[in-house]
Swiss-Prot record:
Pfam families: NGF (PF00243). It is found in: Secreted. Residues 1-23 are annotated as: Disordered. PANTHER family: BRAIN-DERIVED NEUROTROPHIC FACTOR, NERVE GROWTH FACTOR NGF -RELATED. This is Neurotrophic factor BDNF precursor form.
Length: 199
């Protein structure tokens, strides 16, 4: 991307036309899907090194949603897309097991809570709490040899429309109360503490 942090690249060789016959094509697609899923799992496993403290139950595991760039990134971060794809694979595996018994009209999937995602800078949120519980200043701009880059965060939050106030989808409101709410997560970002130390 445009002056952004480097992400690991995924490369495949050949294309579907180079495969011979339907059986070979099926084997090739299965092999490619297995390889892609294996790479995704390895990347996601590496991201689950940092654990939040037990007191902060709203905190998720560490996820990479930070990018340094000279302009607003045009796409979501790669690891976010990989997480979404893995969730899709998990849901697909589950639906394949129950597909025979399900009504065709009910096979579509909807999120329990509607959400929106966008890139934001430290201009919107100037302070944060680090993993030791200290309040730190989030750096909006980072100096580099040829100028400066902005630090962008890919923020996902509950949608202000729809089910956020009415409760979660799929919950029987006659018996249960539910609520969609945005939770906090830890990310690796450039910050400054009260002693002006940057890290």
């Amino acid at each position: 991307g445009q002056g952004s942090l480097a992400y690991p690249g995924l490369r495949t060789q050949g294309n579907l036309e180079t495969l011979s016959g339907p059986n070979d094509a099926t084997r090739g697609l299965t092999s490619l899907a297995d390889t892609f899923e294996h790479v995704i799992e390895e990347l996601l496993d590496e991201q689950q090194v940092i654990q939040p403290s037990k007191e902060n139950k709203d905190a998720d595991l560490y996820s990479s949603r930070v990018m340094l760039s000279s302009q607003v990134p045009l796409e979501p971060p790669l690891l976010f897309l990989l997480e979404e794809y893995k969730n899709y694979l998990d849901a697909a595996n589950m639906s394949m097991r129950v597909r025979r018994h399900s009504d065709p009209a009910r096979r579509g999937e909807l999120s329990v809570c509607d959400s929106t995602s966008e890139w934001v800078t430290a201009a919107e949120k100037k302070t944060a709490v680090d993993m030791s519980g200290a309040t730190v200043t989030v750096l909006e701009k980072v100096p580099v040899p040829k100028g400066q880059l902005k630090q962008y965060f890919y923020e996902t939050k509950c949608s202000s429309k729809g089910y956020a106030k009415e409760g979660c989808r799929g919950i029987d409101k006659r018996y249960w109360n539910s609520q969609c709410r945005t939770t906090q997560s830890y990310v690796r970002a450039l910050t400054m503490d009260n002693k002006k130390r940057v890290g």
